[in-house]
Amino acid sequence: MTLPLLGPMTLSGFAHSWFFLFLFVVAGLVALYILMQLARQRRMLRFANMELLESVAPKRPSRWRHVPAILLVLSLLLFTIAMAGPTHDVRIPRNRAVVMLVIDVSQSMRATDVEPSRMVAAQEAAKQFADELTPGINLGLIAYAGTATVLVSPTTNREATKNALDKLQFADRTATGEAIFTALQAIATVGAVIGGGDTPPPARIVLFSDGKETMPTNPDNPKGAYTAARTAKDQGVPISTISFGTPYGFVEIDDQRQPVPVDDETMKKVAQLSGGNSYNAATLAELRAVYSSLQQQIGYETIKGDASVGWLRLGALALALAALAALLINRRLPT
C-alpha cells in the first residue's frame, strides 16, 4: 500500500524483526503510566475532608489528559515498526537479461485470416515489442522454417532487430526444435560475454509460431520441439510461446487451397515443458496485448525495497501531536 506523502507502507518482510523486542519497553512504559495514575488517585483520596478537596480542585481531571500519553505510545509503536525494517516489492528494469525472439517464417504465415496477413501482423507487433522492451535487455532475433537462422545476435540495439524484422522471407517447412536449440546456443554465447557475475544472466525465449512442427514430425525426436523444450528447462531458460492465427486459415500453393489452422496444443506443451507460459492471439490487437504483457514480465524484475520511511514519518507526526496536545491540554510536555 502506498499513501500520499508517506510512501509505501507494509507490515511484512521485516529485515530486522528483532527490533520488535522494543515492544516490551513500550509495554513497560504503559504499565508505569497506569501505576502512576492509580497512585495519583490514591493520593487524592487521602483528603479526609472532601469539601476541602473540592474547593482546592473544583474540577475533576479531564479524560483528555491521557491523549498526550496515548500519542506518545503510538509514536513509539510506529518507530518500532520502522526500525524492524518492513519491505515491499519494487519492480526495477533488468539490465543483464537476454531475450531471443524466435519467429516462424514458414509458408503458413502467408495466411490472411489475420489482417493484413499473419506475417505482417507478426512484424508489426514484434517491432512494437522491441521498442517497448527495457533498454538494458539484450534482444536477439531468429527466423526459422526448415532451418533456423540467427538474424540478430542479442544486443541492446533495437534498430538492428527492427530492420531485420522488415526483411523476413518465407521458406518451406517448420523446424521448431532446431529454432529452440539455436536460440539456446545464442543465449549461451552472449551469456559468456556479458556474464558479469557468478551466474549467467537471466534469459528467455519468446517463440512465435502458427503451426505445428513438420521437421521432425515427432516432437519427441532428439531434434524435436519437445526435446528442445526440455533442454531449455534444464538450462533455466523458460519459453514463452505465442500461437498466432485462427482455425480457419489457409494459403494458396500451386493454385490449391491448403488449410493452415493454428496449432495451440503443441505450443502449450512446449511452454509447459520449458517452465514458461503459453499465449494465443487471433488478431493483431490481441497479439500486441500479448507482447505488452510479456514486456512487463521480461523487462522488469521484482526486488525487496525499504518501506520504513512511511512509518518513520507517521511516528514523527504522532510525536509532534503528543507534544502539542501536552502543551494545550496539560500545559506541559508528556511525562
UniProtKB/Swiss-Prot annotation:
Pfam families reported in the protein's UniProt record: BatA, VWA_2
Annotated localization: Cell membrane
Main location: membrane
Topology in membrane: Multi-pass membrane protein
SMART domains: VWA (SM00327)
PROSITE patterns hit by this protein: VWFA
SUPFAM superfamilies named among the record's database cross-references: vWA-like (SSF53300)
Keywords: Cell membrane, Membrane, Transmembrane, Transmembrane helix
InterPro entries according to UniProt: Aerotolerance_reg_N, UPF0353, UPF0353/GerABKA_families, VWF_A, vWFA_dom_sf
Keyword NAD: no
GO CC annotation: plasma membrane
Record-annotated membrane-spanning stretches: 18-38, 67-87, 309-329
Domain VWFA: 98-294
Family as reported in the entry's similarity comment: Belongs to the UPF0353 family.
PANTHER family registered for this protein in UniProt: LEUCINE ZIPPER PROTEIN 4, SPORE GERMINATION PROTEIN
Name this polypeptide is given: UPF0353 protein BCG_1543
